[in-house]
């Protein structure tokens, strides 16, 4: 196993990142195993409608990397604090090389519980990658809050 450490230039300070102040292994390094096909990355978009700020708008983009025999399926479930699924979707993963980019259609949630500092309402997103027999091969997730920040007249 090899670990490559970069030393950045003094110009890296423009991005205000600490990589120009530090070099070497300064943080924890993790090594973990993944299945042959796995969820490499995902982006959640959770905002409120622009008219009344009551309806939640949920979007999800996922990158699946690797390849698997047969047809894999990607599923998500958005659950409230009681564990009740309020959104669910499942689609087949079409193998198009080693990286597959999947975008789910935006979904609307009426009367969503909004997130704020005073009322930090969070939903749980569960992502599951299943093999052709329906067995879960990779599972991940995160907490999701619905809010909108904007500047307007």
Predicted regions located by residue number:
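Secreted/periplasmic carbohydrate-active enzymes, especially glycoside hydrolases
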Residues: 1-153
């Amino acid at each position: 196993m090899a670990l490559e450490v970069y030393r950045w230039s003094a110009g890296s300070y423009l991005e205000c990142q600490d990589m120009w102040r530090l070099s070497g292994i300064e943080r924890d390094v993790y090594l973990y195993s993944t299945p042959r096909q796995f969820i490499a990355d995902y982006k959640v978009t959770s905002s409120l409608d622009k008219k009344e700020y009551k309806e939640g708008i949920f979007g999800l983009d996922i990158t699946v990397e690797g390849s698997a025999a047969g047809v894999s399926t990607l599923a998500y479930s958005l659950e409230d604090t009681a564990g009740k699924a309020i959104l669910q979707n499942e689609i087949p993963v079409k193998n198009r090389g080693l990286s597959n980019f999947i975008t789910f259609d935006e979904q609307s949630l009426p009367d969503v519980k909004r997130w704020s500092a005073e009322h930090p309402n969070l939903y749980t997103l569960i992502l599951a990658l299943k093999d052709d027999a329906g067995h879960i091969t990779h599972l991940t997730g995160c907490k999701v809050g619905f809010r909108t920040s904007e500047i307007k007249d």
